[in-house]
Amino acid sequence: MAKKKKDLDLASSSHLNQIQGSTNAIFNVIFVILALACIIPVVFIFMISISSEHSIKMNGYQFIPSAYSLDSYKFLLREGQMIVTALGVSVAVTVIGTVIGVALTMLMGYVLSRSTYKLSGFFTMVVFIPMIFNGGIISSYVVNTQFLNLKNSIWALILPLCVSSFNVVICKTFFKTNIPESIIESAQIDGATQFQIFGKIALPLSKPLMATIALFLTFGYWNDWFQSSLYISDTKLYSLQALLDHVQRNIEMMANNPSLGVTTAQYMNSMPKEGARMAMAIIIIIPIACCYPFFQKYFISGLTVGAVKG
């Protein structure tokens, strides 16, 4: 009898493994499709960037160009100083904004997670409301330009994106579910201040969360061009994304302007317009794509803990 039961258990276990194997195969196919959906557009953009302008005009965008050319990258190298300046602005904004954003977000999340803080519920609601309603572009523009005087300032690219309600909620959930009150009470009995508890207990236990918030902020700052379009008119303060938008608009304006002279028109015809746009996009993608693998482990674990347990 026991042997028959054991055989049944083995059979059911084998059947379960077969189901899991087929399910894994389905998920693998789905993930491969999603990965290709992310990779193929980047490869396609790169292939366009190394296509000759004549090939693009004659045949349109092709995954395998009929004629290859590096004229797009040579054209951008001639504007190397502007690109280097924009790269410096992007790096500075991303680094400074990420550091400040992580510090403020972690502090807010920790304070709101403490049940001993009497105003935790009220300020949690204050943080949560902007996730549903916001003041709009006009009010933000008035505050940043007339009250804070951030027009043509690098801080106009940093402060508006510094703290996100979504990130604060993730931090609050993480601290509330992963740092028991008993540990904090023990530290307080030993004479530790709140800043000591935060720095020596909370932060060391929240490295995955910090990496997750840092990645969110890094991607947000690096890919942002909207703040530049609102607050920046000085080309020396353009980020890479803003520079790409600026170059694209200038190319379109010159290409569609019938009042230009013959020499300028000939130059525009010979300039790799489409290829230059794609080459600029590749230059923007490379730095952030190289950073992601180093934080992938922390990103996945931190996002899972912060979001699912809440």
Regions inferred by a protein language model and the residue ranges of each:
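A hydrophobic, multi-pass inner-membrane permease signature
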Residues: A2-G310
